[in-house]
Amino acid sequence: MNYHRRLHPGRCGNGKGGLVNIDCSGNRVAGMIFGPKRVIVVAGANKLVDDLDEAVKRLRRIAPLNARRIKHHTPCVETGKCMDCQVQQRLCNYLTVINHGMKFPGRITVVMVGEETGF
């Protein structure tokens, strides 16, 4: 979970919030986008950023740490920064942005924890 402060149905594009994710296989983001009737996202304050550009920068800065944690063999593990690699174990295959949930109001609930959680 990343950019902006809140996810408000019907307020897309006015700086009220959204969810930005990068995923390796798409299995985590797929369930957020379509599937269950309710989605609850719990995230720490360290995941909040000011805008979409900052969200993507943050994800690319964090991805090498996560790749190292799960023992993927990618260039970013070696260099410590995103190399926009084209290898099979790449973590950054799917970038999703959920701007709002107008189609299904109340389906996504974001619970913010007032401390740092994970990467």
Task: List each model region and its residues.
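Conserved phosphate- and dinucleotide-binding cores of soluble alpha/beta proteins
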Residues: N2-F119
